[in-house]
Amino acid sequence: MILYHGTDIDSALDILNHGLDAAKLTALQLERPTQLGPGWYAAYEPEVAWFFASLAPGNVGRGYTVIAIDIPDDVLNQLVAARQAIRNAIVNVPFGAQQYWFDLRAFEVLNTHTTFRPYAGQEPSHG
C-alpha cells in the first residue's frame, strides 16, 4: 500500500535519509494537538498530505513537501493487529479523508520494512 505524509523540507529529508525517529517526532509534537496522540500520520491521498504539509510548523520560510511510503500489506496488517497502526477518518478538516496513525512503537518495523521516497507529484492548485 502507498500512503503519503506531508511535512516540512527538513523533516522530509531526515525521514528519507535516516527513517522515522521517535525522539525527534515527540519533541515536534510536544504541546501540539494530535488527533490520536503522539505518533506518525499518513494519508491515503497525496492531496491530503499536501494540505497537512502546508501546516507543518517547520515550513515557514523553508517550504514543505510530501513523501510516499510503500508499506507491504502484511506489515501493515501486523501493525494493525498489534494496535500500533489505526485507520481512521481525519476530523476537523474541511474535507473527508482517511489516514493511518502509527504508534511510536511501530517505527522500528516501519524503518525496516517500508520504503520512504520523495513523492513526484505536484501540489494541487487551489485557484
Predicted regions and their residues:
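Conserved NAD+-utilizing ADP-ribose enzyme module
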Residues: 1-2, 10-11, 32-38, 47-127
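Histidine-centered active-site/metal-ligand motif
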Residues: 5
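Short aromatic-glycine-(Arg/Gly/Cys) micro-motifs in beta-strand/loop hairpins
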Residues: 10-34
